[in-house]
Structures are given as C-alpha cells and as structure tokens.
Amino acid sequence: MGWFWADGNASAAAPVVPPSHKDLAASGAVPPPSCPMHNKTMDALSAHKPVTPAPEPTPAAAAPSKCPVNHGAKDTLAAAAAAVAPKQPQPENHQPAAASEPSFFSKLNPLNYMFSSISQEPAPNQAIALPTERDPSSIPKGTGDGNWEYPSPQQMYNALLRKGYTDTDITAVESMVAVHNFLNEGAWNEIVEWERRFGKGLMRGWEIMKRGEENAPMMLRRLEAQENDPEPQPTLIRFQGRPKDMTPKAALLQVLGRINSKYATEPPFDRHDWYVSRDENGQKKEVRYVIDFYSAPPEPTGEPVFYLDVRPAVTVTGACERLLRWGGDVWWKASGGEVRERERSK
C-alpha cells in the first residue's frame, strides 16, 4: 500500500469511475538494501609495513674504539617517520566513486518514502502494454492544492522493478493498483469518521459516544444539526509505510493467539502511519493515525477480503479518543444500555 505521488510533472488524470474490485490480489515484499559503502582507508594504511626498530647492540658486540653515537639512527628514524606520517590531502579525484552517485534514499519522496518520480514509459523487454492514466483519490492534500493521485499501472510496474521485484506478474498489475486504491479509500473513510467524532474535542466526542457505537451516528447527526457549523475537513499531510514494524496492538493479538486459539489471527501484511491535519478551534494540529492491513479468507465467489484496523496513534489525546470510543461502547452494553433503550422505545 501507500503508492501515492503528487508530482506536477506526472501526467494529469481526469476524474474517472473507480475500477472494479473483483478478482483482485495484493502482495507486499521488502525492498532491496541500499548500495554498500566502499572502505578504502584500511587498504591504504595496510600498504605500509610497520617499521621494526633495529635491536640494540650488546656491549660485548660493540667495538670499544667506535664512536658511541649511532650515525645510522638518523636515517632509520627518518624512514619510520615517513612511513607513519599523515599523508597530504589528495586531490578530489581520489574521492570514492560512490560519493558522486546519489544514494537510494535520496531518490525517494520524503513525504512518503516512495520514488518521487516514476516514468510512464514501458520497461525494457516489457511484453504487455499497461495503462498510463492515473486515478484521483478523494483524499485532500495537506498543502491545499487538490487531492492525492494514485499511480498508473505502468508507474506501479516501473516502481516494482526499481525496488527489485523483477519477477512481478505484469498481468496482475492492474488488479494490484485497483486493490491499492480501494484499500486506501477505505482507510481514509475510517479516518474521516474518527475526525468527525473527536475533531472538535474530547467532551464533544463523549457526547457522541456515551450511548455506544450503535447510537453514535444518530448522536453525531443530531449534534451537527444543532451546531449548524460546517465541519472542517481533515487533510492528509504525508504517510509512511512501515511493513516491518508491528504495532503494539497487532503484537498483543499475536500473543493472545498463542495462548488461546480463539484469538489466533494472521499478522497484518502491511502497516501505515498517516499524518493528518486537524482543524481544532481554528488551530492546525497534526494527528498521526495507525493502520493495520489484514487479509481474510476469500468470499465464496472468489473475491478477496481485507480488514483495516484504523485508529489514532497512542499519544495522550489519541489514547483518550480510543478509550472513549471503544470503552464507551463496552460500558453502554455492559451497563444494560441496550435493554434500557428498548424499554424506553416501547
């Protein structure tokens, strides 16, 4: 997941109908490591052999008539000093060749750690032509200049090749792009729901959540009608894919699954951190959301099934929001709120 680009030099894409999500497949892999550094310092030092001082002559071997000053010591010390003295700075053409080449990470977009520019040209020896149209997302940029765009199938394929996935099935790329776009749209819809409930503060969030999750949509609509104040829309500042970093919640679920098979679940196949701009009482605030992507057994018709666990990161405010939403729902049910609601409606 996470293949957004917002470069202006990319081909513009008109709004199009989202592609079909049937018979979709997604996969993830780990990009290859960056180029190794070249270390020539030790080779340069090892070219000089250490100078072994000459053994001092014993008194018996010394001629009594010879001058006591060793006239050869001067030459020996000079040679030793030349061997260990630091060399003068070399011209710049002696710099390691790797220093003149851009590093792997310098080629990535700092907003999302993806390639900042991906060609729309077919790859060498590409047997099948791929579409170059890019679909716009419904996710507004934090910069305020429109929405994020999804990569075209050709860009996705080129990016996979640049990351080292040379065995990618080119016939599955369009389905991969459709799955990617579908999941990111679902993740953003979940974030918007969190922002609608807690974007104006914890007290308002509690008013919405105090009657459980089932009544929250009704409470939210009632509050919005009373306030008659348009809700500021959140925007996505940046995001980061972190497939190797398991979240604490996902790790806890894995531990519970080892204790009791009832809680056993496959680990998430991907993790994202999305940084969202929240308008809180006229002040811009950056809020981090954590997203775990889970796959599930396919539908009987063969369609793939995915689960997204979207929630605020465990900060002071984020932890309170999670407690109010999930804890409030548990309390409403455990305290008999559902029963009281049914009795009142009779």
UniProtKB/Swiss-Prot annotation:
Group of enzyme by EC: lyase
Superkingdom in the source lineage: Eukaryota
Keywords: Heme, Iron, Lyase, Membrane, Metal-binding, Mitochondrion, Mitochondrion inner membrane, Repeat
EC number: 4.4.1.17
Catalytic activity from the UniProt record: holo-[cytochrome c] = apo-[cytochrome c] + heme b
Region annotation (Disordered) ranges: 1-68, 81-100
Cellular component GO terms, alphabetical: mitochondrial inner membrane; mitochondrial intermembrane space; mitochondrion
Keyword field contains Heme: yes
Chief subcellular location: mitochondrion
Localisation: Mitochondrion inner membrane
Placement of HRM repeats on the sequence: 34-39, 66-71
Annotated transmembrane regions: none
PROSITE patterns registered for this protein in UniProt: CYTO_HEME_LYASE_1 (PS00821), CYTO_HEME_LYASE_2 (PS00822)
Record's keyword annotation contains Repeat: yes
GO molecular function, one term: holocytochrome-c synthase activity
Function as written in the Swiss-Prot or TrEMBL entry: Lyase that catalyzes the covalent linking of the heme group to the cytochrome C apoprotein to produce the mature functional cytochrome.
Family: Belongs to the cytochrome c-type heme lyase family.
PANTHER family with a match to the protein in the record: CYTOCHROME C1 HEME LYASE, HOLOCYTOCHROME-C SYNTHASE
Name used for this protein in its record: Holocytochrome-c synthase
Organism: Neurospora crassa (strain ATCC 24698 / 74-OR23-1A / CBS 708.71 / DSM 1257 / FGSC 987)
Gene: cyt-2
